[in-house]
Amino acid sequence: MSLRLTSAFVLFVISACIGAVPPAAAQSEPPVHAPVQANPDIRLLGGEWIYVEDRTEGQPMERLGPPMASKFSMRVEDALDAVILNGHGSGHRDVRIKLDGTRTEIAGENSRVVRYRGSWKNGVFEYEVDFGREPGKPGIGILRRRFLVTPEGLIVRVAVDPPAEGGEVESVGLYRHAEDIPLATPAKGTIADVAWIAGAWVGTRPSGSSIEERWSPPLGGAMLAVSRTVNTSGRMVAFEYLRIVEREGGLVYAAQPGGAAKTEFVLTEFGPTESGGKRAIFDNPRHDYPKRIVYELSADGQLTATTGFLKGGTPRRYEFTREDR
């Protein structure tokens, strides 16, 4: 398996825009949020924003997720007359949106021209993207996004035209700067508490690709691992360095997809499952995706790893058996 830590989380960029999901705190009924109050300072839009929770009403838990990319950035020009977009999910970088309604045109696929147009009014930054879809053809024609800075963070509203069949007219999400997102509360534990993860684990993805994680036995307060994914052509398409280490009375899970800089998750919960197995949960609310990594060992010795958001959505699931079985 590869617990790939993609910064843009492309899976949600389009599907969530087409109609995603209720507040992360919702179980069966959405919570009631106080009316939001705009901050008129456009400069507060600047910086990198991380998805926190869904604020769309009326969707089941499995559809919870961000209304656009789980991480994006904006930069307000010094003259306060334009905003530069990055990571907004349209496949374009450094898109300059003028606030006077002037169109920004970018060459798209199949010689089509994608047009951006934005405005700033009453504390709300809004822009639309016209993908130039031909009438009667499938796909998104116009994408509209609104950004409102409030005391609790950035409220993002996304609507598509035409709306997806069965999808919401508008999706809403809360974003914050990473430093404004509370850290996870760590659980007390030692490396012995997750020793059951040790071993050589192999599996097969629905695509036919083979996956493996090879975990060393616990020693010196740590466990080390390497993950690898090989496609049906026999080519390695992903690898990852992993480790679990003791720190300040708890455990930290560190992942380096492709050998990149590490991302850390803290152990927040561990223990037996209702079915007689074992479970360990590692969280990092400040990461864009995944925010949670869960390992479970079933009573019959099968290992499962899932990656996803803290609440809701459809986690990615990886299933393993011991190589020597």
Sequence positions of predicted segments:
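Bacterial N-terminal signal peptides
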Residues: 7-20
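N-terminal secretory signal peptides that target proteins for export/translocation
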Residues: 1-4
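Signal peptide processing junction and immediate N-terminal pro/mature segment
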Residues: 17-29
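Hydrophobic small-molecule pocket/channel-lining residues, especially in calycin-type beta-barrels
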Residues: 28-325
